[in-house]
Structure formats: C-alpha cells, structure tokens
C-alpha cells in the first residue's frame, strides 16, 4: 500500500504556521563573507556547490574533462523564475545565477546574525536553498523575501513560496 503524497501547499501552510513572527533585526554587520567563501565543497564530493547545483538544474549539461567531472561547461535551463529556456555557456556573460531562495541578507536580519559561522555556511550551500535561475530575475529580487518579491512566472509562485518557507523552517528563520 502506497500512501498518497501530501500536497505541497498543505505542508507549506503547516510550516508557515510554525514560523516565528518577529521584526527584522538590523542589517548591521552583514556581509556576504559572514556566510563563508562562496561555493564551497561542503558535501566533500570534490565539486563546488555552484557546479553541483548547475548539474542538478540544467538539462544536457556538458562537463569539463577531469576535475572529478564537476565543472559544468554548458547546458540548458528551464528557468522556473521566468519560464524561459536559457542556454548556459561557462565564461560568457552570466545568463544564469545560482539564487539563494532565502537571500543571505534576508537570513541575516531574520536570525542568521546570531548563528555560528558553520551554520551560516551550511545555509549558503544548502541545495534546498539554491536554484539555478535567470540572472536578471535573481538580481531584481536582491535580498527580498516572498512578501516583497515573487518570480515573474506566476505558475512558479506557489512552489517558490513553499520552498522559501521550507528553508526558513529548516533553519528556524522568521
């Protein structure tokens, strides 16, 4: 007997009910460096987090020879934020960013300022909190949370909000 999967909305609503409601803390002291050097190999697979996410999110990913077959040279992204198909080519002007679904600046003012560095590094490199997306959409978002910004693709709004709630619940952010 297989149990039916619970709809994501039910789980997200339950998690949202459990999130604390508090005012944002000051942004004083925030800097990207508070979350460790970008794109570490936190899972010790020989690949940095950026390439792990590109391999996960791109189709037809072509990997560079050597270096643990980690470095993604090219591929195609079905961008959840815009709904567009985007060709990725390493070295060209960045058309794809890796987005922190819960932006690090937002995490800082909703609890991460008081964390140990190891926990901030974990959040910054957690695949749950990372998506390959259109660079322009990511940069338009900045440090906004789901109350302030939603992806331009309306069919992704619910999944985006649910993912942000899941990250905030996992790390006990507000």
Language-model features: where?
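N-terminal carbohydrate-binding/catalytic regions of secreted carbohydrate-active enzymes
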Residues: 32-76
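Extracytoplasmic/secreted envelope proteins and their assembly/folding machinery
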Residues: 12-16, 27, 50-54, 74, ...
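N-terminal module-boundary/linker segments of secreted carbohydrate-active enzymes
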Residues: 1-47
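Domain-level detector of nuclease and nuclease-like folds
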Residues: 81-174
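Short low-complexity stretches enriched in small and charged residues
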Residues: 5-9, 52, 58, 89-91
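Glycine-rich, flexible loop/turn motifs
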Residues: 26, 49-50, 111, 119
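Sec/Tat-exported extracytoplasmic proteins
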Residues: 19-23, 27, 34, 39, ...
């Amino acid at each position: 007997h297989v149990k039916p999967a619970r709809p994501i909305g039910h789980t997200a609503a339950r998690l949202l009910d459990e999130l604390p409601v508090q005012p944002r803390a000051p942004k004083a002291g925030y800097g990207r460096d508070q979350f460790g050097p970008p794109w570490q190999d936190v899972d010790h697979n020989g690949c940095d987090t950026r390439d792990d996410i590109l391999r996960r999110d791109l189709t037809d990913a072509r990997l560079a020879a050597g270096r643990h077959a980690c470095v993604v040279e090219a591929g195609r992204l079905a961008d959840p934020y815009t709904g567009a198909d985007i060709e990725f080519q390493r070295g060209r002007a960045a058309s794809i960013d890796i987005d922190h679904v819960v932006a690090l600046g937002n995490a800082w003012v909703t609890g991460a300022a008081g964390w140990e560095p190891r926990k901030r590094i974990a959040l910054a490199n957690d695949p749950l909190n990372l998506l390959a997306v259109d660079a322009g959409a990511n940069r338009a978002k900045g440090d906004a949370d789901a109350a302030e910004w939603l992806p331009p693709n309306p069919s992704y709004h619910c999944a985006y909000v649910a993912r942000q709630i899941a990250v905030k619940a996992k790390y006990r952010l507000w």
